[in-house]
């Protein structure tokens, strides 16, 4: 990801490298607990119902504990019967957000920080970006994750 802004002296050009060619889409999925980010996964390209189902069954469900709440937006792939069954079979509950309410989804704050850190790292290849994401998962300490949950209204301090 390329940085969006830069700084230089007034009246001078900012020298910077910018990517040329087609944009590449990466999809990052993860869960958020009060003690950190769990079940991270990066897909090369956009996801569909099949990809999301595989993520839930193979990565998210093993990380779930009975009584966990899985917060989902209204993306069509989130509403599949197999996804609902897998999450409920793990003893977790599902909470669907109202339309257009990213402020109620605490993982959005994680994604915002992750995007900022990725732009700052300015990696140009998919492999470097994947490695950087893997390293950045540890940039979310428990106190910060707790604040994200409190800010979205799901827990008290």
What spans do the regions from the language model cover?
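Short functional hotspots at interaction and active-site rims
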Residues: 1-157
